[in-house]
Amino acid sequence: MSTATTTTSATTTMSVVQPRQQELLHLTSTPDITPYTRHGYLFGQKLAASMSPLLHSIVYSHLSLNWAQLRLDSPSIPLFLQLAQHPDFYGASVTMPHKVAIIPHLDHLTPECRDVGACNTLFLKTDPATGRRLYCGANTDVIGVRESFVQNVSDPARVYESRPALVIGGGGAARSAVYALHKWLGATDIYLVNRDKSEVDAVIAECTERGYGDRLVHVASVEQAEGLEGPGAIVACIPDFPPKTEKEMLVRRIVETFLMKEEKGAMLEMCYNPSPFTELGALAEHEGWQVILGTEALIWQGIEQDKYWTGRTNEELPIQQIKEVIAAKLAEASKSHTS
């Protein structure tokens, strides 16, 4: 398992709260766990299009494990905490809107989870002194960003190391991108471009509080972008919608200014739903940038999750098969979206 498994204590321990009846009404039924030896959950809301259960099913089939990740589409953290007490539960992918709210209920956090302030992975450990099951939080989104660049850029020293980076957006994915660029990818300054200044201010404040916000720069105008050194790595964390409002169009012009600078680099386009082939990605490619599809981040964060849950290494997991199945699934989804 990676060094990310080193844990630090959270402020409170895993709490079990009986779900209120009105919360249970939001969930038509809990998933059937009886066919499986062990089970986990994809816990969040609006999960129908998620490829997470598919990705993990490939791993479990390859390892001959009768395991499954089941969708738990619910607003109720108490319900999830109750289900997580089952002896055959192995862990969970945690998605929106629970990535921050789940943290106070965990026993330990990995350094990445603590520093980003969001948990997308719940895994289990055993207290050696008491034998008690410990519920631990990790953030593998940062691994997804890191490995997207490491696995796909052949000359990182030339492309992005010791150069500024650019993050487009101001949500949770942007925070993970900032962390990965700062900690592992050798970024100097990290430019932030977003339509909402308050979101950028929040990212800078949170990262500063956690010790890595001093090199963050809010780029708020085309003129400012023109005067800055061009980035080597770009992470785009916004939906694939044509800009309509004045603020959205300003963001597009600022990004175009960076893309048109003489020295190019690599852009990770985090958006892959309904298609990984986005308008922004096409623009970057036209300007001579290497574009890395967002499915790479999906795959690598998922692989890291399975390392926590199964204890296996990258070499033991079917990475190429995962890539092929996800690519085929996306091609099918893209075809239906355009037809």
Swiss-Prot record:
The keyword Oxidoreductase applies. Induction: Expression is induced in the presence of quinic acid. The quinic acid (qa) gene cluster is subject to two levels of gene control: a primary system which responds to the presence of quinic acid via the qa-1S repressor protein that blocks the qa-1F activator, and a secondary system which represses transcription of qa genes in the presence of a preferred carbon source such as glucose. Its EC number is 1.1.1.24. The keyword Repressor does not apply. Quinate dehydrogenase; part of the qa gene cluster that mediates the catabolism of quinic acid (QA) and as such, allows the use of QA as a sole carbon source. Catalyzes the first reaction in the inducible quinic acid catabolic pathway by converting quinate into 3-dehydroquinate. The qa cluster encodes 3 inducible enymes (qa-2, qa-3 and qa-4) catalyzing the first three reactions in the catabolism of quinic acid to protocatechuic acid (also known as 3,4-Dihydroxybenzoic acid). It comes from Neurospora crassa (strain ATCC 24698 / 74-OR23-1A / CBS 708.71 / DSM 1257 / FGSC 987). Keywords: NAD, Oxidoreductase, Quinate metabolism. Pathway: Aromatic compound metabolism; 3,4-dihydroxybenzoate biosynthesis; 3-dehydroquinate from D-quinate (NAD(+) route): step 1/1. It holds the Pfam family Shikimate_dh_N. PANTHER family: BIFUNCTIONAL 3-DEHYDROQUINATE DEHYDRATASE_SHIKIMATE DEHYDROGENASE, CHLOROPLASTIC (PTHR21089:SF1), SHIKIMATE DEHYDROGENASE (PTHR21089). This is Quinate dehydrogenase. It catalyses: L-quinate + NAD(+) = 3-dehydroquinate + NADH + H(+). One of its GO terms (biological process) is chorismate biosynthetic process. One of its GO terms (molecular function) is shikimate 3-dehydrogenase (NADP+) activity.
